[in-house]
Amino acid sequence: MDTINRRIRVRFAPSPTGPLHIGGVRTALYNYLFARQHGGDMILRIEDTDSNRFVPGAEAYIIEALEWLGIKFDEGVGYGGRFGPYRQSERRDIYRTYVRQLLDSGRAYIAFDTPEELEARRAEVPNFQYDATTRGQMRNSLTLPAEEVERLVAEGTQYVVRFLVEPNVDVEVNDLIRGRVVIDSSILDDKVLYKSADDLPTYHLANIVDDHLMEVSHVIRGEEWLPSAPLHVLLYRAFGWEDTMPRFAHLALLLKPEGNGKLSKRDGDRLGFPVFPLEWKDPQTGDISKGYRESGYLPEAVVNFLALLGWNPGNDQDVMSMDELIRLFDIEKCSKAGAKFDYEKGRWFNHQYIQRKDNAELAELFRPILRENGVVATDEKTAHVISLVKERVNFIGELWEQAGFFFIAPLSYDEKTVKKRWKEDTAKQLGELAELLDSHRSFAAEATEPTVKNWIETNGYHLGNIMNATRLALVGESKGPHIFDIMEVLGREETVGRIRRAIEILG
């Protein structure tokens, strides 16, 4: 199996059975990093062979989510390419050809056993599986006369095509993460490859045929597919494609924060974090699940966070851009063990990226929140405000919590703060401060601060009392950045107006 001189081609092949789970996002990301690092191609293939589980809107959701995260494709659904179509439901004729090839070569057979008959066998025989020891007792083209098989097919009797697994064959799987694994084919069952009921192949056949025809060089997927890898190797052999079989890499699971089991939506609901990249509305129940985007995460933070769940660059660096991840990523250094999902670390990453992001870009993201609150502000003012408060926030949505008072004057004052900060002589002193500020020429922080502090010292007032009471008047509580920075943003008229309004209300 020589892949040294092959062009690197990987695929992300989700099924449109619901929203893309964050574990699936990580799989897409690792494929993307690997492809870009090697100058290869990234393919988007939609594996929609299971019509019973198809969910309207899921395919569009998957594409939008990956675009938001900056995971780009070179070909596939929505991108085109010379190996299309890339939606499996549109490749029926192709699959039929290869089903027939397996039947003609004796590597597969037709089985007519009904679901009820199979269920009865399972009830009779503990751990029953359809394999070399049982296929001779079942209703299939190996046990029925050829003319009866032809008659049943011609009459429209529903059937499946099963792969004929030869027993006592060593099947070797070379995994880039887990190393060399050899299993005895005798433990494998004769998997269904095709169902006449819907004229579609199962995952196993479609997957192998598509990867071969699309010249996929590496299959990077979740470890839930590891038990199927020996079957896939046997299918490559059956078709005579072993020399061009892709290299496999099976990624360890994302685990619950406690480490006991696979991460699920229920864990997110229980602990208060998203498990989907974007908000998802279930078309059947109408239930809405929050996404990372709607929760205020930056896409680059999500990418960085996910990249380090199951892989690390071998140094102390945590914060890495997509370009840095592409340069450093090594599929063979991915962990064999599952990675605990540390949602607090995700918050930390988002905080780091908010600090690094340009204030003008953050202002663009903050604008919809301002609109929701009835605020119209200049880009310049919004960016200035963000520069003052962003070190206190982990998410875009928290900007309003920290900065809303810059845009809307407080309608009330925190009772505890009033009791603690509003003294008997506060109204008189703030009245004098309002007069001073109203006559001050420049309202830049570096101009007002020395003037106010000099006035406080000259009058023998207490600096802390004046500053705390002024903050209460301007903000409504004891929070916010440097008080003179607040004054500068608010401007003379608004600052003086808020101080005088507080005096009027609090007395």
Swiss-Prot record:
Annotated Pfam families: Anticodon_2 (PF19269), tRNA-synt_1c (PF00749)
Assigned GO CC terms: cytosol
Motif extent ('KMSKS' region): 262-266
GO biological process, alphabetically ordered: glutamyl-tRNA aminoacylation
Gene3D superfamilies: 1.10.10.350, Glutamyl-trna Synthetase, Domain 2, Glutamyl-tRNA Synthetase, Domain 3, HUPs
Domain of life according to the entry: Bacteria
Residue interval(s) of motif 'HIGH' region: 14-24
Residues holding ATP: 265
Chief place where the protein resides: cytoplasm
Keywords for the protein's UniProt record, in alphabetical order: Aminoacyl-tRNA synthetase, ATP-binding, Cytoplasm, Ligase, Nucleotide-binding, Protein biosynthesis
Enzyme class of the recorded protein, top EC level: ligase
Family matches, as PROSITE patterns: AA_TRNA_LIGASE_I (PS00178)
InterPro entries referenced in this protein's UniProt entry, alphabetically: aa-tRNA-synth_I_cd-bd (IPR045462), aa-tRNA-synth_I_codon-bd_sub2 (IPR020751), aa-tRNA-synth_I_CS (IPR001412), aa_tRNA-synth_I_cd-bd_sf (IPR008925), Glu-tRNA-ligase_bac/mito (IPR004527), Glu/Gln-tRNA-synth (IPR000924), Glu/Gln-tRNA-synth_Ib_cat-dom (IPR020058), Glu_tRNA_lig_a-bdl (IPR020061)
Catalytic activity, reaction form: tRNA(Glu) + L-glutamate + ATP = L-glutamyl-tRNA(Glu) + AMP + diphosphate
EC numbers for this chain: 6.1.1.17
MF (Gene Ontology): ATP binding; glutamate-tRNA ligase activity; tRNA binding; zinc ion binding
Compartments (UniProt record): Cytoplasm
Family (UniProt): Belongs to the class-I aminoacyl-tRNA synthetase family. Glutamate--tRNA ligase type 1 subfamily.
NCBIfam families in the cross-refs: gltX_bact
Subunit text: Monomer.
Its job: Catalyzes the attachment of glutamate to tRNA(Glu) in a two-step reaction: glutamate is first activated by ATP to form Glu-AMP and then transferred to the acceptor end of tRNA(Glu).
Protein name: Glutamate--tRNA ligase
